[in-house]
Protein backbone atom coordinates (compact mmCIF):
# COMPACT_ATOMS: atom_id res chain seq x y z
CA UNK A 1 0.00 0.00 0.00
CA UNK A 2 1.34 3.41 -0.98
CA UNK A 3 1.97 5.90 1.81
CA UNK A 4 -0.17 9.00 1.55
CA UNK A 5 1.80 12.19 2.25
CA UNK A 6 0.78 14.46 5.10
CA UNK A 7 0.71 18.16 4.20
CA UNK A 8 0.28 20.92 6.78
CA UNK A 9 -1.32 24.19 5.69
CA UNK A 10 -0.90 27.40 7.67
CA UNK A 11 -3.59 29.86 6.54
CA UNK A 12 -1.89 33.01 7.87
CA UNK A 13 -3.61 36.00 9.44
CA UNK A 14 -7.14 34.95 10.49
CA UNK A 15 -8.66 38.17 9.16
CA UNK A 16 -7.30 37.46 5.68
CA UNK A 17 -8.14 35.32 2.70
CA UNK A 18 -6.11 32.30 3.83
CA UNK A 19 -8.95 31.10 6.07
CA UNK A 20 -11.36 31.41 3.12
CA UNK A 21 -9.03 29.44 0.86
CA UNK A 22 -8.64 26.47 3.21
CA UNK A 23 -12.41 26.16 3.39
CA UNK A 24 -12.30 25.07 -0.26
CA UNK A 25 -10.04 22.08 0.48
CA UNK A 26 -12.97 19.61 0.44
CA UNK A 27 -13.73 20.56 -3.19
CA UNK A 28 -10.48 18.96 -4.32
CA UNK A 29 -9.47 15.31 -4.33
CA UNK A 30 -5.93 15.67 -3.03
CA UNK A 31 -3.96 12.46 -2.77
CA UNK A 32 -2.67 13.53 0.64
CA UNK A 33 -3.68 13.96 4.24
CA UNK A 34 -4.25 17.69 4.52
CA UNK A 35 -4.15 19.24 7.98
CA UNK A 36 -4.70 22.93 8.65
CA UNK A 37 -2.70 24.39 11.56
CA UNK A 38 -5.09 27.11 12.67
CA UNK A 39 -7.59 28.17 15.29
CA UNK A 40 -10.53 25.83 14.85
CA UNK A 41 -13.08 28.30 16.24
CA UNK A 42 -11.95 31.05 13.86
CA UNK A 43 -12.21 28.58 10.97
CA UNK A 44 -15.70 27.41 12.01
CA UNK A 45 -16.83 31.03 12.34
CA UNK A 46 -15.56 31.80 8.83
CA UNK A 47 -17.32 28.72 7.43
CA UNK A 48 -20.60 29.87 8.97
CA UNK A 49 -20.11 33.40 7.65
CA UNK A 50 -19.44 32.09 4.14
CA UNK A 51 -22.29 29.57 4.41
CA UNK A 52 -19.93 26.62 3.83
CA UNK A 53 -21.57 23.34 4.77
CA UNK A 54 -18.46 21.37 5.70
CA UNK A 55 -17.25 19.33 8.64
CA UNK A 56 -14.34 20.77 10.56
CA UNK A 57 -12.72 18.26 12.91
CA UNK A 58 -9.84 18.57 15.34
CA UNK A 59 -6.88 16.24 14.85
CA UNK A 60 -3.26 16.14 15.94
CA UNK A 61 -0.45 16.68 13.47
CA UNK A 62 1.49 14.17 15.56
CA UNK A 63 -0.97 11.31 14.98
CA UNK A 64 1.00 8.79 12.91
CA UNK A 65 -2.21 6.79 12.25
CA UNK A 66 -4.09 9.64 10.61
CA UNK A 67 -5.92 8.52 7.49
CA UNK A 68 -7.08 10.56 4.53
CA UNK A 69 -9.82 12.95 5.59
CA UNK A 70 -13.42 12.09 4.97
CA UNK A 71 -15.41 13.74 2.21
CA UNK A 72 -16.47 17.30 2.90
CA UNK A 73 -14.17 17.48 5.92
CA UNK A 74 -11.31 19.72 6.96
CA UNK A 75 -8.88 18.38 9.56
CA UNK A 76 -7.51 21.05 11.91
CA UNK A 77 -4.62 20.94 14.35
CA UNK A 78 -6.03 23.53 16.74
CA UNK A 79 -3.85 26.49 17.68
CA UNK A 80 -5.56 27.98 20.70
CA UNK A 81 -6.18 31.70 20.72
CA UNK A 82 -8.83 33.84 22.30
CA UNK A 83 -9.93 36.97 20.61
CA UNK A 84 -12.05 38.36 17.86
CA UNK A 85 -11.44 38.38 14.14
CA UNK A 86 -12.58 41.31 12.03
CA UNK A 87 -12.36 40.20 8.42
CA UNK A 88 -10.11 42.42 6.37
CA UNK A 89 -8.56 44.07 9.44
CA UNK A 90 -5.22 42.49 10.39
CA UNK A 91 -4.55 42.66 14.12
CA UNK A 92 -1.19 42.40 15.88
CA UNK A 93 -2.98 40.39 18.58
CA UNK A 94 -3.09 37.52 16.06
CA UNK A 95 0.68 37.50 15.50
CA UNK A 96 1.25 34.76 18.12
CA UNK A 97 -1.34 32.55 16.37
CA UNK A 98 0.26 33.06 12.96
CA UNK A 99 3.76 32.37 14.32
CA UNK A 100 2.61 29.34 16.35
CA UNK A 101 0.93 27.90 13.23
CA UNK A 102 4.16 28.30 11.27
CA UNK A 103 6.29 26.89 14.10
CA UNK A 104 3.96 23.90 14.48
CA UNK A 105 4.12 23.10 10.76
CA UNK A 106 7.90 23.55 10.62
CA UNK A 107 8.43 21.33 13.67
CA UNK A 108 6.12 18.65 12.26
CA UNK A 109 8.16 18.58 9.04
CA UNK A 110 11.53 18.57 10.83
CA UNK A 111 10.37 15.78 13.17
CA UNK A 112 9.04 13.68 10.25
CA UNK A 113 5.40 13.93 11.28
CA UNK A 114 4.62 15.79 8.03
CA UNK A 115 6.00 15.61 4.51
CA UNK A 116 5.44 19.22 3.48
CA UNK A 117 3.94 22.51 4.50
CA UNK A 118 2.10 25.18 2.55
CA UNK A 119 1.75 28.70 3.86
CA UNK A 120 -1.13 31.01 3.23
CA UNK A 121 -0.74 34.79 3.06
CA UNK A 122 1.09 36.24 6.07
CA UNK A 123 0.62 39.88 7.03
CA UNK A 124 4.29 40.62 7.66
CA UNK A 125 3.71 44.04 9.22
CA UNK A 126 1.50 42.42 11.84
CA UNK A 127 4.04 39.82 12.92
CA UNK A 128 6.92 42.32 12.85
CA UNK A 129 5.33 44.45 15.59
Where are the language model's segments positioned?
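Contiguous, glycine/small-aliphatic-enriched amphipathic segments in soluble metabolic enzymes
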Residues: 1-129
Amino acid sequence: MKNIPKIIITPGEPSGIGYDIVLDIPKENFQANIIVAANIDFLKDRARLLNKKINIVEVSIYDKNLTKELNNTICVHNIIENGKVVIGKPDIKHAPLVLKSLDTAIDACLDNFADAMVTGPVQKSTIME
